[in-house]
Amino acid sequence: MPKKFRSKCTMTNLLDLIGDKWSLIVVRDLFLQRNTFSQLLNEGEENISTNILSDRLKKLKESGFIDFVNDRNDHKVKHYYLTDKGIDLNTVLYEMSMWSNKYLDRDFNKVSTYFFKVTQDLSRDLVISKSKSVYKEERDKLLDYHRNQQLYNVSF
C-alpha cells in the first residue's frame, strides 16, 4: 500500500517517512555497520526498545530505505542494509551532525567527536561521497557473502 502524505510539501513528505524519533538513528547505525537486530538494539547508546526497533525496521523497509538478507548460517538472523535510497540519506545525516556541532554547546560521544576531528579539514562533498562509497563497498561484501552461500545450499 502506498504511503499517504499529509500534504504536497517535499519537507513534510520526507518527515512523514523518516521524521520520527528513531528512523534516522537506525539509518545512522546501519552506516556504522550495525546490521543485525541485536547490534541495532544493543550497540547504540539511545536504548531503543525492541518493539520500536521492529516497527522502524518494518517502516524503513516498506518505504524502500532498507532491505535485508538472511544470514548464511542462521536464517533466523537478518542482516539489514541501506538501499541506494537509504544511502542518499547520508547527506541529511551529515548536515544534521554539522548543525549540531556548530550550534549545540555540549560534549558529544566518541564516534561524533572522532568524526568531527577527521573531517574538519575536508570538504562536505568529499566526506559525503567517501562515506557513501565506503558504505556501498561494505554492503556489497555483505550481500555477496550471504547470497553466494545461499546459492550453494540449494539441493538437487
What does each of the following model-derived ranges do?
Residues 45-71, 75:
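Canonical helix-turn-helix DNA-binding module
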Residues 38, 58, 78:
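Residues within the helices of the helix-turn-helix
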Residues 5, 21-27, 37, 122-131, ...:
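Short histidine
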Residues 91-156:
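C-terminal regulatory/oligomerization modules of transcriptional regulators
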Residues 25, 29, 65-67, 95:
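Solvent-exposed, amphipathic alpha-helical segments
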Residues 19, 72-96:
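Basic, amphipathic "hinge/linker" alpha-helix immediately C-terminal to the N-terminal HTH DNA-binding motif
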Residues 9-52:
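N-terminal helix-turn-helix DNA-binding core of bacterial DNA-binding proteins
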Residues 1-10:
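A detector for short, charged/polar N-terminal pre-domain segments
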